[in-house]
Curated annotation (Swiss-Prot):
InterPro entries associated with the record: Cyt_trans-like (IPR004821), NadD/NMNAT (IPR005248), Rossmann-like_a/b/a_fold (IPR014729)
The family this protein is said to belong to: Belongs to the NadD family.
Annotated protein name in UniProt: Probable nicotinate-nucleotide adenylyltransferase
Summary of the function given for this chain in its UniProt record: Catalyzes the reversible adenylation of nicotinate mononucleotide (NaMN) to nicotinic acid adenine dinucleotide (NaAD).
Pathway note: Cofactor biosynthesis; NAD(+) biosynthesis; deamido-NAD(+) from nicotinate D-ribonucleotide: step 1/1
Enzymatic class: transferase
Domain of life: Bacteria
Keywords: ATP-binding, NAD, Nucleotide-binding, Nucleotidyltransferase, Pyridine nucleotide biosynthesis, Transferase
Organism: Caldanaerobacter subterraneus subsp. tengcongensis (strain DSM 15242 / JCM 11007 / NBRC 100824 / MB4) (Thermoanaerobacter tengcongensis)
One GO process term, biological-process aspect: NAD biosynthetic process
Family matches, as HAMAP family: NaMN_adenylyltr (MF_00244)
GO terms assigned for molecular function: ATP binding; nicotinate-nucleotide adenylyltransferase activity
Catalytic activity: nicotinate beta-D-ribonucleotide + ATP + H(+) = deamido-NAD(+) + diphosphate
């Protein structure tokens, strides 16, 4: 009997995408035996309204450049093609239509986001449509996160998991700040992404792209 398709969904602004994202996606893919991981650059995320987000075209192309050599990785424009704010519930519903109801979806997110899942739009419905995988790093204080995981499991069953991934102290915020200050970003992200940032002069102090 053929098993159901298992797809990982990795959403994020990817501003820019870096090795931390890629290592996390690969670790979760291996742990849950996913057929592929689909990276979904956010279009107009409601939780990022406090800072200026780089143009979605640049973020989408950088994500393609970063993932193109991995046959298990794919990039979707499903959110950047959508008008207005982009919500996870709408994205999962669209993927359900594309891949069928029998497909199992695993939404990959940072452990800190677990603390906010129940506040997401239509969280109740969302937690019934897909599994959640919270990626944590070794040494991270996890009591608060574990408590939230237990709370969600009591309400919805085994729909959320925690996976410890190799620790990489890399963040998109740090990369943007380093570029703005003229500091090197080599070994923090794939070379094609670094060249793209240089070519289009992204993350400069006066960047208006």
């Amino acid at each position: 009997m053929e098993r159901e398709l298992r797809l990982g969904i990795m959403g994020g602004t990817f501003d820019p995408i870096h090795y931390g994202h890629l290592v996390t996606a690969e670790a979760v893919r291996d742990e849950f035996k996913l057929d592929k991981v689909i990276f979904v650059p956010a279009g107009n995320p409601p939780h990022k309204v406090k800072r200026k987000v780089t143009d979605k075209k640049h973020r989408y192309l950088m994500t393609i450049l970063a993932t193109i050599t991995n046959p298990f990785f794919e990039v979707s424009s499903i959110e950047i093609d959508r008008e207005g704010y982009t919500y996870t519930i709408d994205t999962i519903k669209e993927f359900k239509k594309m891949y069928g109801e029998k497909t199992l979806f695993y939404f990959i997110t940072g452990a800190d986001a677990v603390l906010e899942i129940l506040t997401w739009k239509n969280a109740d419905e969302l937690l019934r449509l897909c599994y959640f995988v919270a990626a944590t790093r070794p040494g991270i204080e996890g009591n608060k996160i574990d408590q939230e995981l237990d709370k969600i499991r009591k309400l919805y069953g085994d729909v959320i998991y925690k996976v410890t991934v190799p620790s990489l102290a890399i963040s998109s915020t740090d990369i943007r700040e380093r570029v703005a200050k003229g500091r090197p970003i080599k070994y923090l992200l794939p070379e094609p992404v670094e060249r793209y940032i240089q070519k289009y002069k992204l993350y400069k102090e006066d960047d208006s792209r």
